């Protein structure tokens, strides 16, 4: 099973990936957890380029770098893992490209869909959990002791995180549009809820769609 997690930075995706991984392993499943960009040596190198503050990258260059990272990850790691019947949990996938580079940067959505299809080898998640959070709340989480205007320019932020409030508002709107257009795949969850409450909603969704996944099996392997 292939499960992806989406949302703006600070929405709590990584926390939910860890919580679900722990649950699935306790049920005896082989679980592989990954992030985008990353997951292979080449993809991690691309991640460093994309997040480095000193790098002035054009929107189309950014798009193609994300696509290159994804192509490496899908072909070298995700597809082989799924073929071996592992459950793959991925922090970000092509919905991030549509939301960030499409709605956020203003690139042509039809072009993005073509590139996403090529880079992902037409692989589609079984379920995508979109954790919905306002940009203001996201930055408050990251910088609870700082004012919002200062936070977007803080030296601790990476290149993507410095894109600003208006950018992240467009990204959030993009995510909401994607979720509304694909309700069978994308499950929207209020990210202002407590982590345990979000986790319960995630497990309830999996139970309703793939209940057999949470049945106890022998063993359990974390990849």
Curated annotation (Swiss-Prot):
Signal peptide annotation: none
MF annotations from Gene Ontology: ATP binding; dTMP kinase activity
Catalytic activity: dTMP + ATP = dTDP + ADP
Task of the protein: Phosphorylation of dTMP to form dTDP in both de novo and salvage pathways of dTTP synthesis.
Protein name: Thymidylate kinase
Keywords from the UniProt entry: ATP-binding, Kinase, Nucleotide biosynthesis, Nucleotide-binding, Transferase
Annotated Pfam families: Thymidylate_kin
Binding, ATP: 7-14
Paired cysteines (S-S): none
Example GO BP: dTTP biosynthetic process
PANTHER family given in the database record: THYMIDYLATE KINASE, UMP-CMP KINASE 2, MITOCHONDRIAL
GO cellular component terms, A-Z: cytosol
E.C. designation(s): 2.7.4.9
Lineage: Bacteria, Pseudomonadati, Chlorobiota, Chlorobiia, Chlorobiales
Assigned protein family: Belongs to the thymidylate kinase family.
Domain of life: Bacteria
InterPro entries noted in UniProt: P-loop_NTPase, Thymidylate_kin-like_dom, Thymidylate_kin_CS, Thymidylate_kinase
């Amino acid at each position: 099973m292939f499960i992806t997690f989406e949302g703006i930075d600070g929405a709590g995706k990584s926390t939910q990936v860890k919580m679900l991984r722990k649950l699935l392993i306790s049920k005896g499943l082989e679980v592989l957890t990954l992030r985008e960009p990353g997951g292979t040596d080449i993809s991690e190198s691309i991640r460093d380029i994309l997040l480095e503050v000193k790098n002035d990258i054009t929107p189309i260059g950014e798009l193609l770098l994300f696509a290159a990272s994804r192509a490496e990850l899908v072909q070298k790691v995700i597809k082989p893992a799924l073929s071996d019947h592992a459950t793959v949990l991925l922090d970000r996938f092509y919905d991030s490209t549509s939301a960030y580079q499409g709605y956020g940067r203003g690139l042509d959505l039809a072009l993005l869909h073509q590139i996403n299809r090529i880079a992902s080898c037409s692989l589609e998640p079984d379920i995508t959990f979109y954790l919905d959070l306002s940009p203001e709340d996201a930055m408050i989480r990251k910088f609870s002791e700082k004012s919002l205007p200062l936070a977007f320019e803080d030296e601790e932020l990476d290149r993507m995180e410095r894109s600003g409030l208006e950018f992240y508002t467009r990204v959030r709107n993009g995510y909401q549009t994607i979720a509304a257009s694909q309700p069978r795949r994308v499950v929207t969850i209020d990210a202002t809820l407590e982590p345990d409450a979000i986790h319960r909603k995630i497990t309830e969704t999996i139970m309703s769609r793939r209940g057999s996944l949470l049945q106890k099996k022998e063993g359990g392997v974390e990849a």
